[in-house]
Curated annotation (Swiss-Prot):
Pfam families: Ribosomal_L5, Ribosomal_L5_C. GO terms for molecular function: rRNA binding; structural constituent of ribosome. Binds 5S rRNA, forms part of the central protuberance of the 50S subunit. It comes from the Eukaryota. PANTHER family: 60S RIBOSOMAL PROTEIN L11-RELATED (PTHR11994). It is found in: Plastid, Chloroplast. This is Large ribosomal subunit protein uL5c. Part of the 50S ribosomal subunit; contacts the 5S rRNA. GO terms for cellular component: chloroplast; ribonucleoprotein complex; ribosome.
Length: 238
């Protein structure tokens, strides 16, 4: 049952959700254009969030109907959307895998659901990770997309400790859209602009000061320091 404190936090989250979407439109585009004026002569080519993919591999355990059903329910609680069941494309005898065998779950979030999940991830979930030291810069791919792994589902506020039979994690892929199909850039430019975008959206990137020479990062840090951050105790301490 939600108490008054929880309701206040939920109201604050909805405000933060609106702020993230609005700040992207009025803030991140000028910063990226300022950082790469030649690259972004057309403002429609500025990278933006396209979708978030959440994946979980279950292996042969997916053949257990009850376990699969429980995992689907967890996905629905966390992502707010029913996941797709991923299946094997071919048989692999050495791993006892048959063709079209159920092996895991995957869900793709766009639009409002994407921003809702992103807000929860930034302001609730990361705060629940024990000894969290930030996100590695090495997890960017050549297109500026970011991939991260979470070791357990208990860090999400929708999951009750008593309902969990087995600790399982996720892989989260945050995909960017670079505007026009004619958009061309060096991989390093895409990665740097991806870093700037994620930093602006308050991702706790563990940059260790190496990127302070980029003026856009200083602008973002000053903007970030003015914002109010929600703080939650770890479930184990409540």
């Amino acid at each position: 049952m939600l108490n008054q404190h929880s309701l206040e936090e939920i109201a604050e989250i909805h405000n933060l959700l609106g702020n993230i979407k609005q700040e992207y439109e009025i803030g991140i585009k000028p910063l990226l254009i300022k950082n790469s004026p030649k690259l972004f002569k057309n403002p429609h080519t500025v990278p933006k969030l396209k979708k978030i993919q959440i994946n979980r591999g279950l292996g042969l355990a997916a053949q257990n109907t009850n376990l699969l059903k429980k995992n689907i329910e967890e996905f629905e609680k966390i992502a707010g959307q029913k996941p797709l069941i991923t299946r094997s494309k071919k048989a692999i005898a050495g791993f006892k895998i048959r063709e079209d065998m159920e092996l895991g779950l995957s869900v793709t979030l766009r639009g409002e659901k994407m921003y809702t999940f992103l807000t929860k991830l930034l302001f609730f979930t990361f705060a629940q990770i024990r000894d969290f030291r930030g996100l590695s810069l090495r997890s960017f791919d050549k297109a500026g997309n970011y991939t991260l792994g979470l070791k357990e589902q208990l860090i999400f506020p929708e999951i009750d400790y008593d309902d969990v039979d087995q600790i399982q994690g996720f892989t989260i892929n945050i995909i960017l859209e670079h505007g026009s199909p004619k958009y061309r850039a060096e991989s390093i430019d895409k990665i740097l602009n991806g870093m700037i975008l994620f930093k602006f959206l308050r991702f706790p990137l563990n940059d260790c000061g190496y990127y302070d020479k980029y003026e856009a990062f200083s602008d973002i840090n000053r903007n970030w320091d003015k914002k109010r951050h929600l703080k939650r105790k770890r479930w184990s301490q409540e």
